[in-house]
Amino acid sequence: MSGASRSLKVDGKVLEGISRGPLPASRKVYVPGVLHPDLRVPLREISQTPTRLGHGPDAKETANPPVHVYDSSGPYTDPAAELDLRQGLPALRESWILGRNDTEALSGVSSEYGRAREADPRLAGLRFAHRRSPRVAKSGANVTQLHYARKGIITPEMEYVALRENLQVEASLAAQHPGQSWGAAIPRVITPEFVRDEIARGRAIIPANINHPELEPMIIGRNFLVKINANIGNSAVTSSIEEEVEKMVWSIRWGADTVMDLSTGRNIHETREWILRNAPVPIGTVPIYQALEKVGGKAEDLTWELYRDTLIEQCEQGVDYFTIHAGVLLRYVPWTAKRLTGIVSRGGSIMAKWCLAHHRENFLYTHFEEICEIMKAYDVSFSLGDGLRPGSIADANDAAQFGELETLGELTQIAWKHDVQVMIEGPGHVPMHLIQENMTKQLAVCGEAPFYTLGPLTTDIAPGYDHFTSGIGAAMIGWFGTAMLCYVTPKEHLGLPDRDDVKEGVITYKIAAHAADLAKGHPGAQARDNALSKARFEFRWEDQFNLSLDPERARAFHDETLPAEGAKVAHFCSMCGPQFCSMKITQEVRDFAAKQGVSDDTALQSALDEKSAEFKKAGSQLYR
């Protein structure tokens, strides 16, 4: 494990190893606000070693500037931050929320289930002890970022994400391919006003519940950096509160922009509270999972009243976005009967079973406006679930999938009428040639609301490697316009992921998201690539490791064959060795050119002429 660690004690058990400390050669830097001067927007600064000009002890050096990269790891990678997991993270947004004067504190939790959990003495050892009173919008108020944006207000959250997206890379914009953005409108510099306008148009969201003040704001939208989500959560057979908190911290260390808690096991309420109070990123949930647990796993026993109470419970805890499968309509369920793999979404199957058991329309659909009323009182964003997504490439782009998408477009308009932020979930399993159709239809049907996809997986033949099969689809659909990608781990379809699987999934999806940013031509996206390529050409091995997405693995792979410290300054690697390194040969040509005072092309031709003469002098024999 990188860095130092801290311990968390819950119910008498101590978890050692909450991931702390910066990544190699990295430090946290903070960019101040302009419209809101109190802002401190975190970036990760990666230092570089100097370039040596020539060889030998007298060789001169020229400095290489540090590289700034997006950082979602929160205070956990800042050695100066004093953290106590039992107290939770500092309430970064508290003064912003209070300063708007449109919310009020409740005397206590208002959900029936929340009150019951607080009154249960058996849970005393599990509870997060330092919980703030939940807040809610004042009567008649709307506290969503979409509402503020439509009123022309640039909130601190909006300026925060604008500064975060720019990465201080203005100087590097010239050294970048223009990209193909498929109709996106990515500006050269992202301003707070651009952020406000994108949110007002529904093309981007800032998931930021007023009861999650610990959150460092981030934005999800087609015209911004492609984001990734990591799923965590306990089950009936495995995991604990301690492990889920560590999974969250571990996920964001490696680059997860949001985290979904998909717990289905014991103590879901308490687990979620611990995660939220220590999470600097948006936390999403699927409320129907907890509602189902409350009725003993019997979908037919679900009721609107129980689900409504679950929504309020989670809103008051601070959940930032809900996956709600309101598009699974009774009339669509028969369309899945002839599918190869039927309904594979857990939430979709729950609602389909309820619809069939009662032969009534999905209560999430019939009560959708009431759900909007709840969510706008806390600024919880919709992630409209694709309950009928294809679970195999054979079922991709069928009538059930696209019928549900049409309904999600209808629901998007209703949510926007209430100024509730919305993103749309997408597939799934889709072969490469059918991927772009998904993006094109979603943009047209859902009014350009952000698209959030699981992959998609591009083939079904690789259990154990589905992070790879889905990473292919994720890179493609991210390029076409998807705003956030939900990671897939190597354990997909096989089991619950462990720490190593989580890291593998996150980094795979960071690669996919970054590849999409490059292809779209996002301003500054290429700066890190250029820096690493320059380090590679100059044999600055430490910089190659440190600039990579996974410095630990890069270093370990290098050291498997060349473990000596001297190998980290050598002008070759184990792939080609010292005699056949193409970059070393190119450098020798450049050195020759510099000594002779000629161009690289002239030097190269001179070297070729020299080798030609040697060949002829040796008898012009191909094999000797």
From Swiss-Prot:
Q: Kindly state what the record says about how the cofactor is bound.
A: Binds 1 [4Fe-4S] cluster per subunit. The cluster is coordinated with 3 cysteines and an exchangeable S-adenosyl-L-methionine.
Q: Name one GO cellular component term.
A: cytosol
**In the record, what terms sit under GO molecular function?**
4 iron, 4 sulfur cluster binding; carbon-carbon lyase activity; zinc ion binding
Annotated residues for binding of [4Fe-4S] cluster: C573, C576, C581
Q: Name one Pfam family in it.
A: ThiC-associated
- BP GO annotations: thiamine biosynthetic process; thiamine diphosphate biosynthetic process
Question: Which InterPro entries does the protein's record reference?
Answer: ThiC, ThiC-associated_dom, ThiC/Bza_core_dom, ThiC/BzaA/B
> Required cofactors, per record?
[4Fe-4S] cluster
**Enzyme class, UniProt record, top EC level:** lyase
Summarize where Zn(2+) binds, as residue positions.
Answer: H429, H493
Pathway(s): Cofactor biosynthesis; thiamine diphosphate biosynthesis
State its Enzyme Commission number(s). Answer: 4.1.99.17
Q: Which UniProt keywords apply?
A: 4Fe-4S, Iron, Iron-sulfur, Lyase, Metal-binding, S-adenosyl-L-methionine, Thiamine biosynthesis, Zinc
The UniProt record gives the binding positions of substrate as N231, M260, Y289, H325, S345, R346, G347, D386, G387, L388, R389, E425, Y452
Which domain of life does the UniProt lineage start with? Bacteria
The chemistry this enzyme catalyses reads:
5-amino-1-(5-phospho-beta-D-ribosyl)imidazole + S-adenosyl-L-methionine = 4-amino-2-methyl-5-(phosphooxymethyl)pyrimidine + CO + 5'-deoxyadenosine + formate + L-methionine + 3 H(+)
Q: What's this protein's function?
A: Catalyzes the synthesis of the hydroxymethylpyrimidine phosphate (HMP-P) moiety of thiamine from aminoimidazole ribotide (AIR) in a radical S-adenosyl-L-methionine (SAM)-dependent reaction.
* Subunit composition and interactions: Homodimer.
Q: Which family does it belong to?
A: Belongs to the ThiC family.
What PANTHER family is this protein classified in?
A: PHOSPHOMETHYLPYRIMIDINE SYNTHASE, CHLOROPLASTIC, THIAMINE BIOSYNTHESIS PROTEIN THIC
Q: What is this protein called?
A: Phosphomethylpyrimidine synthase
Q: Which organism is it from?
A: Myxococcus xanthus (strain DK1622)
